[in-house]
Amino acid sequence: MNPTCDVLEKRVAALEGGVAACTVGSGQAATAMCIQNLAQAGDNIVASTDLYGGTVNLFKNTLRQQGIEVRFADPADPKNFEKLTDDKTRAYYGESCPNPYLRVFPIKEVADIGRPKGIPLIIDNTASPVICKPLAHGAAIVMHSLTKYIGGHGTSIGGIVVDGGNFDWTKNRKRQPLLNEPDQSYGGAVWIDAVPKLTGANIPFVIRLRVVLLRDTGAPLAPFNAWQIIQGLETVGLRMKQHCSNAEKVVTFLETQKKVQNVIYPTNHQGEIKERALKYMKGGYGSLVGMDVGTKENGAKFIDNLKMLYHVANIGDARSLAIHPATTTHSQLNEKELLA
């Protein structure tokens, strides 16, 4: 364990209210390892339909090639997760505030469905550090792309997985065979039994992720990247406050523009979806703002005529940006998936 990475892990774990964390080479590495740490060929997970395009591609294609099925549930109704669950379901997965529709995920509702069954909820909290605390609402695992808000400057790629230490992995041992059956690569160790004895903490998930998946994939975070990200972490609270304030001003301005058909923001939704934003986000509703200008051509024209904003994809760094998700970050999705 590198000491610089160790400092970053402890600080992000503290930020999230978790017990332990493991840094990895990127946010996508964090996502992949979270799933591979619980699921193997023949297993499945249930994931939200509201996800980053790269994650959808990972789930639909790469994990499928490894024999892991990902079933997609519309989070508008949390019961959709239960409907897709069977004896081979190893995890539920969602994003706290998914881009571009910004419909806040029903964290407690889905976590409460999974916990009695022995199914942990994994939340990607990349878009809402500080203002959203998934572990406090029942999520078992939180992950981030450190490249975004926590790093904050667009200088370093990294990812992290935080173990909440709040999930009873022994409740249904058959549900999680990778944690509850002997691991031959470690002399037959059973993670759920061995880790608490060695560490005094309920963190078999993150320990196995570190000593098995990080070992086998070779995707650690570079110590220099960790050092740069630590610099960003020191100001993330102040930056998120300003991000949220700026976004609210942008929303107010866009709502006065006749050519803007719809303004997308967590609190601009109606009904239960808006209530979730109010319930799960405190101190602001994030920096992401979406708008509908009618057609793909209008969107391209808008982007091409920007003078101050950058046309880049890395949210949460020092630059203000604008992007058309359907032709960039979500370009590998088909029309039906884009509409979902």
Predicted segments — roles?
Residues 1, 105-106, 147-154, 225, ...:
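Solvent-exposed, flexible loop/coil residues
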Residues 15-16, 154, 283-285:
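Short glycine-enriched loop/turn motifs at secondary-structure junctions
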